[in-house]
């Protein structure tokens, strides 16, 4: 049973909240047209498939729990455990307002969870790419931070092979605009600082 649809993504993925046997899941699917995506379905499928090793390799208490991946009718689906909470990202204005109106101590805890996750990411041999406010959820009732999107994280060593890399400009370091530049733990430190400004600025 589908109880929620997210079809306004610019990534080429369409996402669903589903329920089966009393358990809720979040499904990310590439291979169908979405309202905001201008690329090809093939590219969307390729990108989602390339994120599979990231979710298989990174296991952290604040990272959304990966369940399985499937090829379906020429498309590709990734299944995660559903989590409740508000998204920090401005693309969901009502949730963003609730998030930014959290008590200072809650926002401080979110920031601590982000720092811990970035430290874990680096120690696991990955660099955060396209990590921004839309990647963060918070369940105020249970005081739980969830990182819900690490699709574009890169295995180290990583070099900028795009010029303008994926991501929100508010959270991107200078090297994420410079073709051939190293993308490393310094990039993650810049990202952490950007989150501090976003949460407390």
Task: Go through each PLM region and give its residues.
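Conserved HxN/HPN-centered segment at the entrance to the catalytic loop
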Residues: 58-69
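Conserved short submotifs of the Hanks-type protein kinase catalytic core
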Residues: 73-87
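Activation segment signature within eukaryotic-like protein kinase domains
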Residues: 110-111
């Amino acid at each position: 049973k589908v109880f929620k649809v997210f079809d306004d993504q610019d990534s080429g993925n369409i996402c669903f909240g589903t329920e089966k046997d009393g358990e809720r899941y979040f499904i990310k699917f590439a291979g169908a047209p979405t309202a905001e995506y201008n690329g090809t379905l093939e590219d969307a499928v390729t990108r989602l498939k390339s994120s599979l090793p990231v979710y298989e390799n990174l296991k952290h208490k604040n990272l959304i729990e990966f369940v399985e991946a499937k090829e379906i009718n020429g498309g590709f689906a990734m299944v995660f455990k559903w989590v409740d909470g508000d998204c920090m990202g401005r693309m969901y204005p009502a949730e963003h307002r609730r998030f930014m109106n959290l008590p200072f101590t809650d926002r401080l805890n979110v920031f601590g969870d982000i720092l811990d996750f970035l430290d874990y990411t680096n120690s696991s041999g990955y660099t955060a790419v396209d990590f921004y406010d839309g990647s963060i959820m918070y369940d105020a009732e249970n005081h739980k931070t969830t990182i819900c999107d690490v699709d574009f994280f890169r295995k180290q060593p990583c070099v900028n092979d795009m010029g303008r890399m994926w991501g929100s400009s508010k959270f991107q370091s200078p090297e994420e605009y410079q073709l051939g530049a190293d993308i490393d733990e310094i990039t993650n430190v810049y990202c952490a600082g950007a989150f501090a400004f976003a949460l407390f600025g």
